[in-house]
Design a protein with these regions (language model features):
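Right-handed parallel beta-helix
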Residues: 34-35, 62-71, 88-106, 124-136, ...
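Gram-negative bacterial Sec-dependent N-terminal signal peptides
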Residues: 1-29
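Extracellular beta-strand solenoid repeats
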Residues: 60, 68, 82, 90, ...
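Surface-exposed loop/turn positions within long extracellular repeat scaffolds
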Residues: 75, 107-108, 136-138, 151, ...
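Extracellular beta-helix/beta-solenoid repeat scaffolds
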Residues: 59, 65-71, 87-89, 98-104, ...
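N-terminal segments that cap or nucleate solenoid repeat domains
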Residues: 30-105, 298-310, 316-317, 323-324, ...
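Small-residue (G/S/T/A) turn/hinge positions that recur once per unit in extracellular repeat modules
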Residues: 57, 65-67, 86-87, 123, ...
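Glycine-rich beta-solenoid repeat tracts in large extracellular/virion proteins
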Residues: 48-58, 79-84, 115-120, 142-149, ...
Length: 449
């Protein structure tokens, strides 16, 4: 990734005032900037609202120049861009440093969605080197709303090298992005301080940063699939569920792949997601609401490359902040490390560590893993699984360090699984078996077999 883009993502808040000052007049208007003429942008310019129906629009931004969509207020969906009937909308740099800014766009009314961009009927959005700042939707998708039909092919929404900051869904879902029945690709992005607010009827308000869901009632129809790669979530909030991410589906599980790949080099290869919270319609952060993520009928894979680390949460925060909750399935793949520092006791789905390491940084923080499945089928009850028969060539490890951990349901370790308990640490399980390696000076207690 170009170093200028890295700088914009890491230092966006400090760069914003001087950046805006250089682009706008003292009154905040874009009067000093010429209107865009065509889609091949050679100089800073202000675009008008775009409306596409079944056709294509491709913007190309020259190095060092800005395409600006700002200050557009509408009482219909799509503050700056409206797409329908399989329209295709693309913004990309000609080389590396051309940038696009969507700022202070809004749509009013609880049924109007997409503060900056609205897309329906299988329209596609492809964006690179983009900043979304302070866009507001009266309904869903503070910055982007995208609805499709889960057709096979390329992603319906593709956003790379982007910053989403301070976007708001006022009476809906997806503070920054709301997508339904779509395939989504997000890479090298940053989501900071986005919010999803609820209505007075205490509905919606899910997905402080992103809400990715599927409501197709046909079980034979494929569910949606989202890839979130090398992307940071910080300070996002939801009055409902899923402070950073909310995901659910009506029939087949929605699929999400959260990855840190070999190319990620910031912070020594350590990506940190923290200070995300969800209230669950209450007065403060709730573990049951999923401060980081809430999984309904969904399957989430954390794929962390060798030598890379994804850290979710901070042990110095309240345990509800950056928590994971819900009933879906979590799978850890890739030989890198996943560190969970929040209180995840309201995650009751199953967890499988197939490769690499999962570290629990907070005591008694994953107690109820597997509860949903075990309640449904007590005779075939699985909670947390370390290692795999099918992936025998991999090495999987659960590291509890010196924490105290209790697992209400089965803890199962295969031959390629390792349980590390440091001195002072303790793991207690009500049932289970471990055919792999147990290391460290801590203690493992299995109440029954």
């Amino acid at each position: 990734m170009n170093m200028r883009i890295i700088s914009l993502r890491k230092e966006y808040l400090s760069l914003l005032p001087s950046m805006i000052a250089s682009l706008f007049s003292a009154n905040g208007a874009a009067a000093v900037i010429d209107s865009c003429q065509g889609y091949d942008i050679k100089a800073n310019c202000q675009a008008s609202r775009q409306s596409l129906s079944g056709n294509m629009q491709d913007w190309s931004i020259a190095d060092g120049q800005w395409l600006i969509f700002s200050g557009m207020a509408n009482n219909a969906s799509g503050g700056a861009v409206f797409l329908q009937h399989s329209a295709e909308f693309t913004i990309s740099p000609q080389n590396e440093t051309g940038m696009t800014l969507f700022a202070d766009n809004s749509v009013s009314g609880e049924y109007n969605n997409g503060g900056a961009i609205f897309a329906k009927e299988n329209s596609t959005i492809n964006l690179a080197n983009v900043i979304f700042d302070s866009n507001v939707a009266g309904g869903y998708g503070g910055a982007i709303y995208s609805a499709g039909t889960n057709d096979t092919g390329a992603a319906d929404l593709r956003v790379t090298n982007a910053v989403f900051h301070n976007n708001i869904a006022n009476d809906g879902k997806g503070g920054a992005i709301y997508t339904i029945n779509n395939d989504v690709y997000l890479s090298d992005d940053a989501f900071n301080n986005n919010q999803a607010y609820t209505s007075t009827s205490y509905s919606d308000g899910d997905g402080g940063a992103i809400d990715v869901t599927d409501n197709n009632s046909d079980s034979k129809h494929p569910s949606g699939y989202t890839i979130v790669n090398n992307t940071a979530f910080t300070n996002n909030t939801a009055e409902g569920y899923g402070g950073a991410i909310y995901t659910n589906s009506a029939t087949a599980p929605y699929l999400i792949d959260i990855s840190v790949d070999d190319s990620y080099s910031q912070n020594g290869g350590v990506l940190v997601d923290e200070n995300n919270s969800a209230a669950g319609y209450g007065d403060g952060p709730s573990t049951a609401a999923g401060g980081f993520m809430y999984l309904g009928l969904s399957e989430v894979t954390f794929d962390i490359a060798d030598g890379k680390t994804l850290v979710i949460g901070n042990t110095e925060n309240d345990g509800a902040v950056d928590s994971i909750a819900g009933t879906g399935l979590i799978t850890k793949t890739g030989s890198g490390d996943l560190v969970l520092n929040a209180d995840n006791n309201d995650f009751t789905g199953e967890m499988q560590i197939e490769n690499g390491e999962v570290t629990l940084g907070r005591s008694n923080s994953l107690m109820n893993v597997g509860d949903t499945h075990c309640q449904d089928d007590p005779q075939d009850c699985y909670g947390l699984t370390i290692g795999s028969i099918d992936q025998y060539q991999n090495q999987a490890e659960l590291n509890v360090g010196s924490t105290q951990q209790t697992f209400v349901h089965a803890l199962t370790g295969f031959q390629n699984g390792t349980l590390n308990i440091d001195a002072g640490g303790n793991v207690t399980v009500n049932q289970g078996s471990f055919a792999g390696i147990i290391e460290g000076a801590g203690q493992l207690t299995i109440a029954q077999n």
